[in-house]
């Protein structure tokens, strides 16, 4: 009996959406799997392992410090929490229930995403700046000045090419003039690899990446790069820190965000492999996969297809091209997307504004043809009214 297939019903799907959490993030390479087997039979000092892994990653990209977290979302919570107690480290005993002090975290209202509320898990209060159309430099600076004595950090969600977005360099310049640290959530902003260094060059205090997307580690891992000051505070409230006093043993906020030894090692190995990747060849492969889909679809009176660079609000990163399919003759793209999930094997893709989109990033060899044939088959059935 195959437990994965027969008991868990995990027979796998064709992923034409991307490295999204809901489809498992990414697949693990042979090198990563080997590293997991090597460490899984050992006991280790977890705090030491976490520090050594962080130091290794930091050296690779020229960061002061680095830390592997339980996903990028945990990195948001921990980095914000570190900023909340930055001036008063003893407040770590009270997280997330803080009273007084700098509790505000400023964010941008036009940087719309589902992860913003995670900031509040740290105990912070979210204060949005501007509106859905962005904010001017003058208004941003005035708002920062107004709330500076109550603000612990500014969180910036990397969503280029978001229209009317303040550039990160200007955000850092103004924030630092008031002594406020800047945290960037760039979880899915790889490739390009240069983004690992781009935000560090801009002077941000922390930049966060998912370990389970382009980097290729477990889906529930994240990487925090930044200043030694803030990441040292994160270690102090992290999952491996314990204190013993007369009242007993004490753990901290990060205890609920544990990262296993296997995940730490896997993320370090995956990170190293990602840095060595031939990015030009990778991007060429992405475009070739898209062209293969176009070729398999062929000329069809019921649809037209082309390769596009997606808009900012699509699943990240938007550096990866997409195949856009525009159906004709009244065929509903949403309906096709839902029916593809019932294909054998199931195919997961997205629709937006009446069009269907295919992301080549997670497609295995030969899946381009399977997807194309399924779409053509469903299109014919729709025309017949089936």
Predicted segments, located by residue:
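Structural motif of enzymes handling amino- and sulfur-group chemistry
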Residues: 35, 247-321
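Alpha-helical metal-binding/catalytic segments enriched in His/Glu/Asp
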Residues: 36, 223, 358
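A glycine-/small-polar-enriched, mobile loop at the entrance of the PLP active site in fold-type I
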Residues: 14-52
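A common structural junction motif
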Residues: 241-243, 341-348, 376-383
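Short, Lys/Arg-enriched, disordered terminal segments
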Residues: 1-3, 380-386
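Conserved C-terminal alpha-helix-loop-beta "cap" of PLP-dependent enzymes
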Residues: 4, 294-373
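Conserved PLP-enzyme active-site core in the AAT-like
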Residues: 2-27, 54-272, 294-298, 374
């Amino acid at each position: 009996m195959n437990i994965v297939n027969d008991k868990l019903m995990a027979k796998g799907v064709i992923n034409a959406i991307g490295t999204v959490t809901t489809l498992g993030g990414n697949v693990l390479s042979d090198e990563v799997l080997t590293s997991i087997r090597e460490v899984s039979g050992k006991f280790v000092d977890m705090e030491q392992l976490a520090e050594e892994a962080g130091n290794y990653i930091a050296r690779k990209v020229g960061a002061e410090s680095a830390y592997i977290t339980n996903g990028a979302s945990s990195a948001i919570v921990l980095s914000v929490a570190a900023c909340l107690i930055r001036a008063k480290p003893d407040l770590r005993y009270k997280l997330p229930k803080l009273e007084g002090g700098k509790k505000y975290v400023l964010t941008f209202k036009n940087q719309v995403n589902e992860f913003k509320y995670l900031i509040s898990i740290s105990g912070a209060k979210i204060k949005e700046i501007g509106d859905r159309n962005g904010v001017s430099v003058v208004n941003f600076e005035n708002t920062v000045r107004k709330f500076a004595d109550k603000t612990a950090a500014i969180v910036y969600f990397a969503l280029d090419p978001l229209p009317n977005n303040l550039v990160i360099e200007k955000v850092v310049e103004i924030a630092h003039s008031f002594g406020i640290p800047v945290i960037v959530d760039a979880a899915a902003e790889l490739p390009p690899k240069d983004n690992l260094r781009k935000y560090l060059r801009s002077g941000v205090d922390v930049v966060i990446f998912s370990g389970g997307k382009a980097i290729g580690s477990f889906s529930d891992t994240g990487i925090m790069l930044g200043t030694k000051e803030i990441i040292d505070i994160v270690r102090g409230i992290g999952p491996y820190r314990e204190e013993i006093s007369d009242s007993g043993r004490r753990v901290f906020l990060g205890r609920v965000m544990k990262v296993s030894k296997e995940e730490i090692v896997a993320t370090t190995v995956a990170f190293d492999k990602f840095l060595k990747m031939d990015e030009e060849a990778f991007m060429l492969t992405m475009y070739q996969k898209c062209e293969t889909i176009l070729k398999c679809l062929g000329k069809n009176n019921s649809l037209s297809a082309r390769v596009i660079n997606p808009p900012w609000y699509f699943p990240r990163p938007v550096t990866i091209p997409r195949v856009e399919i525009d159906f004709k003759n009244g065929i509903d793209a949403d309906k096709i997307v839902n029916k593809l999930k019932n294909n054998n094997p199931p195919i997961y893709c997205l629709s937006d504004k009446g069009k269907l989109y295919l992301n080549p990033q997670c497609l295995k060899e030969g899946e381009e043809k399977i997807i194309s044939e399924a779409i053509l088959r469903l299109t014919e059935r729709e025309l017949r009214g089936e």
